[in-house]
């Protein structure tokens, strides 16, 4: 899959790609999520994605399914028109949706979805807008659930030299998202 949100010249050019085009890409960038070991196959895994942050959840879900897990997805979007590749997500696990306008799934935000009250998850993975991930991390902390966060940010050079993707960690030092 190649899911793109048009935000600048680079992504506009990427949107013009056609099947069979040859492209030169520097991947992967960033760090990967942790895939649990086979001994943990009964772990209840929740993948929470919001906006453009749903794209990495699709790939992670495919990897988890291939490793023998049954992930649960909780996807947030502004409206039903912003929910992408729903059929693909459903291939890899159960899918719950929230939309801000209520046009698909529950109305509201992922952190208010009823599934969080009904099921006790062992591990949460999340990617999306920073306020959403902060809320997810707070929920996970309050429930003593392990949570891995994948930051989304603008990336220009992909190697950290331009410092456009810098984020401050709670410990005080900076890290590059790329």
Predicted regions located by residue number:
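Reductase modules of NAD(P)H-dependent flavoproteins
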Residues: 78-178
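Conserved beta-strand elements of the Class I
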Residues: 44-48
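Generic structural signal for buried aliphatic residues
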Residues: 23-26
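Nucleotide and nucleotide-moiety/phosphate-recognizing core
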Residues: 73
């Amino acid at each position: 899959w190649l899911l793109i949100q048009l935000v600048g010249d680079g992504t506009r050019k990427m949107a013009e790609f056609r099947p069979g085009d040859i492209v030169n890409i520097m991947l992967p960038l960033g760090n990967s999520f942790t895939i649990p070991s086979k001994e943990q196959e009964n772990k209840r895994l929740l993948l929470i994605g919001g906006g453009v942050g749903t794209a990495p959840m699709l790939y992670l879900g495919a990897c988890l399914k291939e490793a023998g897990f049954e992930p649960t997805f909780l996807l947030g979007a502004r409206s039903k028109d912003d929910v992408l590749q729903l059929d693909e997500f459903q291939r890899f696990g159960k899918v719950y949706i929230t939309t801000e306008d209520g046009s698909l799934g529950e109305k509201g935000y992922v952190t208010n979805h009823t599934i969080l009250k009904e099921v006790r998850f062992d591990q949460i993975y999340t990617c999306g807008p920073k306020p959403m991930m902060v809320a997810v991390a707070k929920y996970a902390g309050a429930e003593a659930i392990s949570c891995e966060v994948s930051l989304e940010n603008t990336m220009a050079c992909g190697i950290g030299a331009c410092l456009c993707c810098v984020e401050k960690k709670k410990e005080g030092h900076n890290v590059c998202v790329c």
